[in-house]
Amino acid sequence: MKQIKVAIVGGGKAGTAVLEAFFKDDGFSVTCVVDVMGDNCLAAKTVLKGKGVRVFSAIKEALTVADNIDYFVDFSTAEAVYENTQTYIGAKKAFIMCASGLDVKQKQEIEKRCLAEKIKGAIIPNASTLAVLGMYFDKIAAPFTRDIIISETHDVTKADAPSGTAYNTLVECARAKGHNNFEEKDFKLSGTSVKNSQFIRHVSSGIEVHARRPQTEGVTTQFVELYSEAQRLTIEHVAYNRQCYKKGIELAIVYLEKNGGFLQGLEAAMGLV
């Protein structure tokens, strides 16, 4: 595969970690970074020093060097993801969306537009390959279980609770058990919504998610307990730092370069479907 030129959108913790990983891989080059804070973003103050990589404060500014960008890799905020995808599609630029915040209808609309306009794209809110494998195994095991409890831990700076990965694990396990109702009224919550609750329970399937936000940084975990009569299966994923996302992004790009089209999640790129 030719060297891939990327633009990183979001120069915070995740974007900075992935930047560092890209700098170590000769198969990729970083054209620019986009962050609303410009030169004051974390990436600009740390890993970009001495690299000669330009920092823009808006995607439209980065499009001035679009000929040197093969893929936009987006780690922006949930509030920005939909608008950002519209900008990429409007500019006919390939993208890997790694931020959460899109609902089902928006994902379907984005995929439909990309396929119609032959724009390569992917929506992978969790780019950690082993986290995706964990969810895959959870889904396989779910029909054989009575109770499922999902526990996830992120540091206190994470904006949403539960995480998108934990919520998606609940949805996939519930579907595997024959449940397809996922409106707000179908959950018992400790907070104001399914995106702002440290405890949620899917009423019909009984699957629970417990979210923890300790005053620490670094390690994130998801711990899934699957119970049946007199037995328990535990599937745990631990991410030691955010550089774990780089492998998933690489797999998505390799898949799209070979096959074109659009990816919803990493499963196809990992050969799981």
Can you say where each PLM-predicted feature lies in the sequence?
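N-terminal Rossmann-like NAD(P) cofactor-binding module of classical short-chain dehydrogenase/reductase
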Residues: 70-73
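ADP-ribose/adenylate-binding Rossmann-like module
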Residues: 77, 84-107
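Rossmann-fold NAD(P)-binding glycine/threonine-rich loop
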Residues: 99-121, 132, 136-137
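Rossmann-fold dehydrogenase core element
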Residues: 94, 109-127, 146-151
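C-terminal substrate-binding/catalytic lobe of Rossmann-fold NAD(P)-dependent oxidoreductases
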Residues: 5, 9, 13-63, 146-273
